[in-house]
Amino acid sequence: YRQQGYNKRFRMGGNLTYHQPDMGMKILNYGLNVDFLTNQYGDFFIWRSPTEVYKPSPFTNMGREENNFHIDPFINYVNPENGTSHKIKGRFYHSADNIVRPSSGASITDILGNMGTNAQTIQNIAGGDYSSLYPALVGIGSGLINGNLEDAMNGVFTSLGNIFPNATTADYCDLISWVMDNGIPGDLGSIQNGQLPSDLIPWLSNVMNPSRNDSKTKTDKSYNYYLDYQFNKKWDGGAQITTGMTYEHVRYDSSIMDEVYKSDNVAAFFQYDQRFWDRLSVSAGVRAEYYRVDNHYREAETKILGTKVPFRPVFRAGLNYQLADYSFIRASIGQGYRNPSINEKYLRKDIGGVGIYPNLDIKPEKGYNAELGFKQGYKIGNFQGFVDVAGFYTEYKDMVEFQFGLFNNADYSMINSISDAIRMLMDGKGFGIGAQFHNVSKAQIYGMEISTNGVYNFNKNTKLFYNLGYVYTEPRDADYKERNELEDAYSDALQMKEKSNTGKYLKYRPKHSFKATVDFQWKRINLGANVAWKSKILAVDYLMLDEREKQQKDLMDYVRTILFGQSRGETLASYWKKHNTDYATVDLRFGVKATKEVAFQFMVNNLLNKEYSYRPMAVAAPRTFVLKMDVTF
């Protein structure tokens, strides 16, 4: 449904298990699972304009080709006579992927033609007649004198309108993207000395060549080796222990970074479980992890008795108590710790044309979570099922979040000031739009969830299955006040802020969500429906939107207009304000199981044809009809 969007997948796999005979009560089996996936897809992260929501921006005209393969050997041994078991799991995983263009970009002649380029005006400027540029000069002068950026920008766009009378903001993006692909004059430093770049003529000659410079395909490769051993011992009194070790080695060959990264992760774990009075079950465990990347041998440290050790222990505990028949209460608390992955910390990748940029300063995130829940079974007439209610609380320190921004493609640094933008132009590698993972000092996420699932039995051939759930979440940015004070002091027009508003909520999260699934089955026929409802998104990235009150537009507003388009008076900000609301969707499906091996299903997704977005510029699919056939053999 999105222009230039496609997904072609081929998957093949299998498994082989050998059960050792003549073992008596003991059980021994071993084997392996194998899976291969090849995937080609095209997509985009940024639209062309608010009236072309299913068309890609030229900045994000990219797709990927990838091939994945893994083989998972395993060995299981169980001895019921002494209540022990041994399990060994392994995995070798290989992945290779590279960037492709779903379509070739427009040629310079097409771009200039769409913009209605006035050749006479360009010729007049070349001949020394600068009258068409007067509006820009007057506007900039007025802006400098009066401190009014709007006057300056209106003057600039008026002058550009004299040269490109038919141009839209999307056309300017086409032109900028074309120049980024073909480079800019390398000798921009001579402009500071009042001279034209020495390589201007060769560059202009290349610009007038309608063919783009196609770069050589670069393939990223990763290799993953995983081994896990688990020992379990059960006693007649209801006690059991589970212990073991895990080792994982990752090698990543990055063609873009021209580097090879290696990581090792070693973990040891122990868990004790005990059952009392056939009603109460308690559990407690600890896991200690050591992690390193290349020669960084201490990615994580813990102080024990005044001495720093290069591993991190985390603890968890929980209980489950049966109050009555089909009635249970549970509670759990646990620590969490996660090291940034190689992708998050070291790599430069492209996903849908949006770059993922490295951040060597990112730190591990840590925290804890707690949950209290109640589960009750019920049987009312022909209804039977369970209802579950739970409250949860999670607190993070140095929580890892992504932040969208503009980046200098020369050194992959974020453009965070006007001087950074000037340096990007001087470097001559252009800019990129993308995300960088960074730490949010402190975050709290708490809320409650209620759900029920079950079945209504009409007779042995006719049943109604249902699953309903509601989640309330309070995703708090605990340091938002301090961050707002810091951002209020920003003086550079291009300095990036954390999010689109000054509120207390984390980005890209709704407060409320509800989902219901109902399936009516009669013999081989199935009729089902999905109903989903979500509340609006509470905050997004500052690069996309700025919802703060302001007297006049600032420089970033004009940057957003160019990057994300303005068409028929509509901008991303006005579109998001209109469409970032509570929304509901309905999907229907009808299926027939023709034989034991063959089944057909007809689906209507987004039955009400609701136009909604789960993030800026991610407009979901309109009403879609799908016919599906499943064959099992």
Give a label for each model feature.
Residues Y1, Q20, F36-Q40, N79, ...:
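Transmembrane beta-strands of outer-membrane beta-barrel pores
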Residues R2-N15, H19-V78, N82, F92-G113, ...:
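Flexible loop and strand-edge segments within Gram-negative outer membrane beta-barrel domains
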Residues Y1-N15, Y41-S49, K55, K89-R91, ...:
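Surface-exposed extracellular loop regions of Gram-negative outer-membrane beta-barrel proteins
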Residues K87-R91, S95, Q322, F328-S332, ...:
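Membrane-embedded beta-barrel scaffold of Gram-negative outer-membrane proteins
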Residues Y337-R338, E395-D398, F402-F407, A532-A573, ...:
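C-terminal beta-signal and adjacent terminal beta-strands/loops
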Residues K234-T242, T246-V250, S254-T394:
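Structural signature of Gram-negative outer-membrane beta-barrels, strongest in the C-terminal barrel
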Residues F386, A390-E395, S413-L543:
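Gram-negative outer-membrane beta-barrel transporters
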